[in-house]
Regions:
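Alpha-helical scaffolds flanking conserved acidic
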Residues: 29-37, 66, 84, 118-121
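Iron-sulfur (Fe-S) cluster-binding segments and ferredoxin-like electron-carrier domains
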Residues: 12, 50-69
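Short alpha-helical scaffolding segments that buttress acidic/His motifs in well-ordered protein cores
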Residues: 19, 35-40, 70, 86-94, ...
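Acidic/His metal-coordination segments adjacent to aromatic residues that form catalytic metal sites
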Residues: 71-79
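Secretory/periplasmic and organellar redox-cofactor proteins
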Residues: 1-3, 104-119, 125-149
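Acidic/histidine-rich alpha-helical segments that form the ligand environment
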Residues: 80-123
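Mobile cap/lid helix-loop segments that border enzyme active or cofactor-binding sites
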Residues: 1-32, 54, 58
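Short, thiol/selenol-centered motifs that function as redox-active sites or metal-ligating centers
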Residues: 33-56
Length: 149
């Protein structure tokens, strides 16, 4: 899967650095990151993204039930309020970004759980997942792969 990045070495290298920053340098708690990532993956219908798991997940209380219920982020009792808010942000980021921008009630709720710094990390992470997931899906790259980070 990584081989396709070598076709465009400058952009591929930049995407690799951005990916590294999202997965290894952001400040999101792992469960928050994973619910947001998976919500974007659902919106993108990206099989490789949906099949990706973090090897540290079990230590953070993430099991397959966590992933199985991402589409039920509003109601599944296994998610915290912070995780629900991250899932809502990610879902709306991927499906209706202008309404998200204008939803003052959402932003008030969001600031109950996240600082501006964490929101910035969440938004930039969603940007990576949305863009990369769509590239993978549109070009049919790795759609049968399962990855462990």
């Amino acid at each position: 899967m990584a081989g396709w990045l070598s076709i465009s070495p400058e952009l591929g290298g930049a995407l690799g650095a951005f990916t590294d920053a999202v997965y290894n340098r952001n400040r999101l708690p792992l469960r928050v990151r994973e619910i947001a990532r998976t919500a974007v993956a659902e919106a993108n219908e990206c099989a490789v993204c949906l099949g990706t798991r973090d090897r540290s997940g079990a230590d953070a209380g993430i099991d397959e039930h966590f992933y199985d219920h991402v589409l039920e982020w509003e109601s599944w009792p296994g998610y915290s309020a912070e995780e629900r808010t991250a899932a809502e942000f990610a879902h709306r980021f991927a499906t209706d970004h202008t309404a998200l921008r204008d939803d003052e009630d959402f932003w008030a709720r969001c600031h109950e759980h996240f600082s501006d710094e964490i929101l910035t990390d969440l938004a930039l992470s969603c940007a990576l997942w949305l863009g990369t997931g769509r590239v993978l899906r549109v070009l049919d790259i790795g759609q049968t792969c399962k990855l462990t980070l």
